[in-house]
Amino acid sequence: MISKNLLMAFHNSHSRKAVKYFADTCIGLSCRNVIFSKITSSAASIGIPDAQKSVLKAGGNLLFFSDITDIQEALEPSKSYLLVSRKYGRKSIPYNEIVTELKLGKVLVIVGGTSPGLTRRELDLGECIFADEVISDINPIALTALFLTGLSKVIKDS
């Protein structure tokens, strides 16, 4: 299992399927803390209840906030990362650094639910990181799976 201190957040989506897929991906790859923020339309009315059912059945936690700053205020992570495309990222995913931080406290990783997913203001709310393996934009669910798989490998090896 990935650390109980990992908080995976999906921000700014209007797709109920994307919300459900994000939750299923997190739970399927051993992340138990699934967070949603700025979820609108059918994603909020249908996607969140579907995701909540899946997460709770798997023994996980699902939280819902109106914005990223609310997540940070309520959960007080020691570090916040924004998982973005190479175009917006400042450095590749620092897996070893994240593993060390998870031993010390909560780490929030935010994934944008639409393209580009995060506003300029939101990009300043954490450290922007990208997946080195990805050479062009991929969907946020694939990016989440890539991140969690890479993190799991580093945790197993440490």
Regions found by a protein language model. Give the residues of each.
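Long, charge-patterned amphipathic alpha-helical coiled-coil/hairpin "stalk" segments used as oligomerization
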Residues: 89-130
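RNA substrate-binding interface of SAM-dependent RNA methyltransferases
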Residues: 1-87, 148-157
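Structured adenosyl-cofactor binding patch, chiefly the S-adenosyl-L-methionine
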Residues: 120-158
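Aromatic-residue detector
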Residues: 21, 34, 38-39, 111, ...
